[in-house]
Amino acid sequence: MSKIIYCVFLKKYAEGLDAPCYPGALGKYIYEHISNIAWMQWQDKQTILINENKLNMMNIADRTILEKEMKIFLFGKNFSIKNN
């Protein structure tokens, strides 16, 4: 049985993720504040971004771009883990 969390993306209570899906402090924050539905929406968007921009996940610069886009998508432009 999954936990219910307040999803900051959906702005309502929803089923949380089964396990952390991203490393580090950001991953912990995502696990605690992003629902399974919101994460699936991000995965769809992520696939589009990787394909359209021909991002290479072996390239650190491309991974940095994708992480920035993830933060904007899930939390908004002014998100900082330090402020939350």
UniProtKB/Swiss-Prot annotation:
A GO molecular function term, named singly, is: iron ion binding
Segments spanning the bilayer are none
> One short Pfam family name for this protein?
Iron_traffic
- Return the InterPro entries for the record: Fe_traffick_prot_YggX, Fe_traffick_prot_YggX_sf
An example GO BP is: cellular response to oxidative stress
Q: Which domain of life is it from?
A: Bacteria
What keywords does the record list, in alphabetical order? Iron
Concerning SUPFAM superfamilies, the annotation shows:
YggX-like (SSF111148)
Please give an example of a GO cellular component term from this record.
cytosol
| UniProt keyword Iron present | yes
State the family named in the UniProt similarity comment for this chain: Belongs to the Fe(2+)-trafficking protein family.
* Main function: Could be a mediator in iron transactions between iron acquisition and iron-requiring processes, such as synthesis and/or repair of Fe-S clusters in biosynthetic enzymes.
**Assembly information from the UniProt record:** Monomer.
Q: What is this protein called?
A: Probable Fe(2+)-trafficking protein
Give the organism, scientific name: Blochmanniella pennsylvanica (strain BPEN)
Source lineage: Bacteria, Pseudomonadati, Pseudomonadota, Gammaproteobacteria, Enterobacterales
